[in-house]
Amino acid sequence: EICHKHGAKLLVDEAHGAHFPFSDSFPDEALNCGADAAVLSLHKTLPSLTQTALLITNDSELSEIIAENLAVFETSSPSYILMSSIEKCLDFCENSKDKFKEYCCNLKTVREKLKNLKYLKIYDKSDTDFDYDIGKIVISTANANISGTKLAEILRNNYQIETEMAYPDYVIAMTSVCDTEKAFDMLSGALISIDSELSKGADTERVPLKNLYTGKNFNACELYKFNKETIPFQNSEFRTSAEYIWAYPPGIPLIVPGEI
């Protein structure tokens, strides 16, 4: 409403929401909430090759403007492999209602199995005032004697489960419609087993990440002319950073190159 009040178009980064239209169990899609256009990364949550994405709009005038500008910025040598993957993905979505129904059933089952974890915690809609995508299983380690990064490491090395990302206080397990009931059983079994070996308390190896910025020595573009070295994070106080410090790209960095 604010955008439209001022004559602006609203473009939503809905990269992780390409699966939203296919079940009422997921949040409402951006275009249904008033957005003029949205970007959907098919490869993140649907069966499509990496790099495949869609730019969708419900505004015919905006569609014409986008088409004109795409002619300027798009490559003249598109990948027909990627475009074919997009078409295959869309065909799958149109003809796989039962798959999405089964997927949502598996998501609810795994959450039911994990609701009684003693030290780890699975976030759900009751933990936020915002809508929540149940396809992303957020595992909090805030009240356990283990960090999120360590939990992700154990899941990878001991259970062959690769998580989407790990942070000091949580892990995100990204799921998709292509995950099987067996895969969800593996995840729940692994977390129940790990939880049984934990105790209450904060992990002593966690590094506080708040208020790291203390000043700026150089612009990032000036750093190429200086020598650089790799040192432990604990020894970096008052040193100039030569790279970004962030939990994941393209997230907001805590420190950028040139800062102290």
What name fits each language-model region?
Residues 1-123:
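Conserved PLP-enzyme active-site core in the AAT-like
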Residues 97-100, 104, 181-184, 260:
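Generic detection of long, well-ordered alpha-helical segments
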Residues 115-259:
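Conserved C-terminal alpha-helix-loop-beta "cap" of PLP-dependent enzymes
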